[in-house]
From Swiss-Prot:
Superkingdom field: Eukaryota
Organ and tissue specificity: Expressed in abdominal perisympathetic organs and abdominal ganglia.
A GO cellular component annotation in the UniProt record: extracellular region
Species, as recorded: Derocalymma versicolor
Role description: Myoactive.
UniProt modified residues of type Leucine amide: 17
KW Secreted (keyword) present: yes
Protein name: Pyrokinin-5
Subcellular location: Secreted
Length: 17
């Protein structure tokens, strides 16, 4: 996913975009 984890920096809005 990467919604709040920052793993999918591009899927949602990762904190570490």
């Amino acid at each position: 996913t990467g919604d709040m984890s920052g793993e999918g920096k591009g899927m949602w809005f990762g904190p570490r975009l």
